[in-house]
């Protein structure tokens, strides 16, 4: 939840585009380290992240750790609500997944969808696949669901019965669709698409095209988006300047003006319902016992900074179709 969040996905461009994307790719590393640290001090349970992400050499600030807790909790609640509504007869597309461990955690909980897809930069995918192949704790659960002799895996792609990891470019929708279909994406299944701090690194036109593609590709679908909001104020401008100093441009920041602008772009690009909440509101609505547990882990002397950070990130979700499943009823 820090001012430069995370995992984005666009790759095979010209060399100038690759240079522009370098800062964006770096946000994957930043977010992964923040999550690993928060897990290491007990904010949430994730036995897999330590096998994918090295431990940070520096301690992360308490407000950052609480922000990541709220992010992981909110996204997880929406994912599980979708899985319950569809009784897991669905598929999930995590676009810009980075070092995400959701596949393994859902398997442990008996909540795997028909198939779980991840898409990210080929460079990030290569690193993740190399780690998976060399860590039995990560590789074994995949093989338990798939006959070994038919597993497809190379440096940029893994395709198994229940899990696929794909290196692709979200700005090239024909390439994206082709690669997903090669891994048996089923457009007839209820589909959940997830982006976390991904759309903000695309131009408004590029992110609109992705949202339209998602809306028209699946009859029954839900879209979850986590990213910045309220970026017109002074605190938002400081966030933008900090990222620019790291060669990371928020190309889509104009869509992050308010919760209303976030919902509006979903509705304008083919989605039938749209909801949004800033992360301070979400955090404030957590069960008191859970908040007390989180706040007992570390002392925070500036509550105002936490509130400022939380008010500049939001969780949005949209649905299309699925009336018989009750998708419109889903909330965090």
UniProtKB/Swiss-Prot annotation:
It catalyses: [phosphatase 2A protein]-C-terminal L-leucine + S-adenosyl-L-methionine = [phosphatase 2A protein]-C-terminal L-leucine methyl ester + S-adenosyl-L-homocysteine. The keyword Methyltransferase applies. GO terms for cellular component: cytosol. GO terms for molecular function: protein C-terminal carboxyl O-methyltransferase activity; protein C-terminal leucine carboxyl O-methyltransferase activity; protein methyltransferase activity. It is an enzyme of class 2 (transferase). The keyword S-adenosyl-L-methionine applies. S-adenosyl-L-methionine binds at residues 71, 96, 120, 169-170, 196. Keywords: Methyltransferase, S-adenosyl-L-methionine, Transferase. It comes from the Eukaryota. InterPro entries: LCMT1 (IPR016651), Ppm1/Ppm2/Tcmp (IPR007213), SAM-dependent_MTases_sf (IPR029063). Its EC number is 2.1.1.233. One of its GO terms (biological process) is regulation of mitotic cell cycle spindle assembly checkpoint. Belongs to the methyltransferase superfamily. LCMT family. Methylates the carboxyl group of the C-terminal leucine residue of protein phosphatase 2A catalytic subunits to form alpha-leucine ester residues. This is Leucine carboxyl methyltransferase 1.
């Amino acid at each position: 939840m820090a001012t430069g969040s995370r995992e984005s996905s666009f790759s095979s461009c010209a060399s100038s585009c690759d240079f522009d994307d370098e800062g964006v790719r770096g946000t994957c590393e930043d977010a992964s380290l923040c999550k690993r640290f928060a897990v290491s001090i007990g904010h949430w349970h994730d036995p897999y992240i330590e096998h994918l992400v090295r431990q940070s050499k520096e301690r992360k600030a308490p407000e950052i750790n609480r922000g990541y807790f709220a992010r992981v909790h909110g996204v997880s609640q929406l994912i599980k609500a979708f899985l319950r509504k569809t009784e897991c007869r669905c598929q999930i597309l995590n676009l810009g997944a980075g070092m995400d461990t959701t596949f393994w955690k859902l398997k442990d909980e008996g909540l795997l969808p028909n198939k779980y897809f991840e898409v990210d930069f080929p460079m990030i995918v290569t690193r993740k696949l190399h780690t998976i192949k060399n860590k039995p704790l990560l590789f074994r659960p995949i093989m338990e669901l798939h006959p070994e002799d038919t597993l497809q895996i190379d440096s940029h792609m893994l395709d198994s019965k229940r899990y696929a990891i794909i290196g692709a470019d979200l700005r090239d929708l024909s390439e994206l669709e082709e690669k997903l279909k090669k891994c048996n994406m089923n457009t007839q299944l209820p589909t959940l698409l997830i982006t976390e701090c991904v759309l903000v690194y695309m131009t408004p036109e590029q992110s609109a095209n992705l949202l339209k593609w998602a809306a028209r590709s699946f009859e029954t679908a839900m879209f979850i988006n986590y990213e910045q909001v309220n970026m017109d104020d002074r605190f938002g401008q400081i966030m933008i300047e900090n990222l620019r100093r790291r060669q990371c441009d928020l190309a889509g920041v104009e869509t992050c003006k308010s919760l209303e602008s976030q919902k509006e772009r979903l509705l304008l690009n083919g989605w039938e319902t749209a909801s949004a909440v800033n992360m301070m509101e979400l955090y404030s609505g957590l069960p008191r016992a859970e908040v007390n547990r989180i706040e007992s882990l570390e002392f925070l002397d500036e509550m105002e900074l936490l509130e400022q950070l939380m008010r500049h990130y939001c969780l949005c979700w949209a649905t299309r179709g699925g009336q018989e499943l009750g998708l419109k009823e889903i909330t965090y």
